[in-house]
Amino acid sequence: MALDKRIWMHFDLLPFVFIIPLLVVSFLLIFESSAVLSLKQGVYYAIGFILFWIVFFIPFRKLGRWLFVFYWACVILLALVDFMGYSKLGAQRWLVIPFISITLQPSEPVKIAILLLLAHLIKINPPPFKGYDWGMFLKLSFYICLPAALILKQPDLGTALIVLIMGFGILLIVGLRTRVWLPLFIALLVASPIAYHFLHDYQKKRIADFLSEKPNYHVMQSIIAIGSGGFLGKSKEACTQTKFKFLPIATSDFIFAYFVERFGFLGAMLLFAIYIGLSLHLFFYLFESNSDWFLKIVALGISILIFVYSSVNIAMTLGLAPVVGIPLPLFSYGGSSFITFMILFGILENLLAFRYIFGYNSKPSFGNFGFLAQLVRALGS
């Protein structure tokens, strides 16, 4: 039942050197705050790792048209939110799965769908030396903007911006001709003040609070918690901001402030190093000499997501960005974001582990392969 050892030779263990410490410390903080929440988080961890291994055995390079099916299925789910979505905290972002009463947030799987489809389209149409021209750019932009518009309608400005930054960040880094990106950049600068008038009142208030001289209550308490942590942090009993509930949403949106109060400036620097190291490690796959664009785009997309999520969340807790509901990746309490990232890492590890052994188009002899490796090959043929 063992996997062929050659698969493990290409399995990238370094991401887990970064991920495991995040999960351990996150679980500790959540447990200190609430034993009940820590049990739920443990369930999310279990689901995430189970899905990681399930996804690891899916032959993504062979899916082809099925990636379009997955994409459009996610778009349909996003559209259904407008008609039969479940509202919570003033936003309609969830669907209730019949008979089992479990809520699904379609904006999470759609990130995976967009990334896989972009990887597939770029693989079959690699960027020319000078970058993509208007034709290919508009084609790829359609698949990015359609779900982003549906997410924005929910309304969920934060997630919509994440989708746009991931999608267009990939296109910009992969390569666009100057006559494409320069007018787009100018148009963005001109359109930004106009777009402000189309925001919801609560979104305008967040921007106004951010620009005001005095931060709002949530951000103020977050800054106090961060400052009170000192260089080495405090014991659990001495974390007054969290203990006495001054710090809002201490295990979710503002968990960075809770972490710094607990582990201080030194802990914050280590956390920065983990996120920067993980993002750069994934980003550097783009510079591999081979022409495996599917792998490069998936790794680049995950890198952008981790960098943007962590940067925005930390900036938000420091009062350097408007307060939006963006979690700290692989660290904040909750299942949706964590499970999404574990699925993405499962896809990445699949692309790494099986790219040389099977080639997906070759027909090797199966005699020397383990049972599970043969099963993967059979599913992909």
UniProtKB/Swiss-Prot annotation:
Topology in the lipid bilayer: Multi-pass membrane protein
GO terms under biological process: cell division; cell wall organization; peptidoglycan biosynthetic process; regulation of cell shape
InterPro entries membership: Cell_cycle_FtsW-rel_CS, FtsW/RodA, RodA/MrdB
Chemical reaction(s) catalysed: [GlcNAc-(1->4)-Mur2Ac(oyl-L-Ala-gamma-D-Glu-L-Lys-D-Ala-D-Ala)](n)-di-trans,octa-cis-undecaprenyl diphosphate + beta-D-GlcNAc-(1->4)-Mur2Ac(oyl-L-Ala-gamma-D-Glu-L-Lys-D-Ala-D-Ala)-di-trans,octa-cis-undecaprenyl diphosphate = [GlcNAc-(1->4)-Mur2Ac(oyl-L-Ala-gamma-D-Glu-L-Lys-D-Ala-D-Ala)](n+1)-di-trans,octa-cis-undecaprenyl diphosphate + di-trans,octa-cis-undecaprenyl diphosphate + H(+)
Pathway: Cell wall biogenesis; peptidoglycan biosynthesis
Subcellular locations according to the entry: Cell inner membrane
Extent of the signal sequence: none
Enzyme class, spelled out: transferase
Keywords from the UniProt entry: Cell inner membrane, Cell membrane, Cell shape, Cell wall biogenesis/degradation, Glycosyltransferase, Membrane, Peptidoglycan synthesis, Transferase, Transmembrane, Transmembrane helix
Protein EC: 2.4.99.28
Transmembrane stretches, start-end: 11-31, 40-60, 66-86, 99-119, 132-152, 156-176, 180-200, 263-283, 297-317, 328-348
Predominant subcellular localization, coarse grouping: membrane
GO-annotated cellular components: cell division site; plasma membrane
Gene Ontology MF annotations: lipid-linked peptidoglycan transporter activity; peptidoglycan glycosyltransferase activity
PANTHER family: CELL CYCLE PROTEIN, PEPTIDOGLYCAN GLYCOSYLTRANSFERASE MRDB
Similarity comment text for this entry: Belongs to the SEDS family. MrdB/RodA subfamily.
Function according to Swiss-Prot or TrEMBL: Peptidoglycan polymerase that is essential for cell wall elongation.
Protein name: Peptidoglycan glycosyltransferase MrdB
Native source organism of the sequence: Helicobacter pylori (strain ATCC 700392 / 26695)
